[in-house]
Structure formats: structure tokens, C-alpha cells
Amino acid sequence: VNPFDEIEWIISRIKIKNINGDILFDQDIEHPVFWDEMAVRTCAEKYMKSDLGNLPHNGERSVKDVIHRVSFSITKRGKDLGYLDEKGSKILYDELCWLLLHQFAAFNSPVFVNWWLYDVYGFKGNSKTKRWAIKNRDAEVYQQQFEYENAQGAACFITEVEDELIDGENGIYDWVNTVM
């Protein structure tokens, strides 16, 4: 059973204003009936794409669009790299959709913001950006042609191998104590 077909959907008008009262966002958004207003507003404002020029219906207007984009892209990548067959890909897609729809799991913002505009909508981004990606299961790397070909999925990075959470010379906790 398709996870999107198992639940009831409604459409709500989402209007977001800035401090001065100027309207930043004003759209009808389709979402699960059990999502609260904050979840719908966050998804609409932060993660729905509307400015790429080649999106259906002038942009994403449903939580389905966002969840499909992310879940499809993860399973496509797993299949392309040889980790999943057709059956495993379908199972993982359905499971990811269900978990995200029912809010049992959520990815960090870069996943929802960046993944995978290239795979689903063909959005390439800046071709001058030089990025490297894994080509296959043997961890061969290649230089991407387009910015969103393998989009960034994390916002924070450990700065060096010796970086760690514990106290000590390279510990993050130690650093926090010195700046507070």
C-alpha cells in the first residue's frame, strides 16, 4: 500500500509575514490532516521548492512533494550504487515515506533543502562549483559536473581528525567552556 494513500490529506492556506508585516509566503499547502500548523509552516517555508523554474505546478505545494523528493532520491542513490535491487528500493522508499509522513523520523535541514533537486527535477545549480562524489561501491570518486548532482546532506562537519566531544586539548566541551 502506498503510504501517501493510507492517510487523510487536507489543504491549508499558509501565510508567513516578516517583522514589518510584509507577506513572504502565501500559498495553499496540502498536508496530512494530523500535522500541526507549525510542522506545515516549517515544511512549506523552509523545504518546499518554488523558485527553480521547471517545477510542476510552479513549485512544490504538498508535503507529498517534499517527502517523495527526499525518499525517491535516497532509494535511487542506493539502487544506482548497487546497494538495493528493485524490490529493496520500493520497500525502502515506502518505509522512508511512512516514517516521514507520520513524523517518526526527520532528516536534518540540508537533506530537505538540497536533496535531490537534480534527481527529481533536473535542477543542476552552479556548474562552476567544484565538488567530488562517490561513483560506486568501490568508493571511486569523481568530480561532479553540477552543484546539485550529489547535494550536501549535512550542515556541520568535524574540522579535523583529532576533533572530539570529550574534554581535553581538542575537545569541543573544553572549547565551549573557554568561550562561555
Region annotations inferred by a language model:
Residues 1-180:
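Extended catalytic cores of very large enzyme megasubunits
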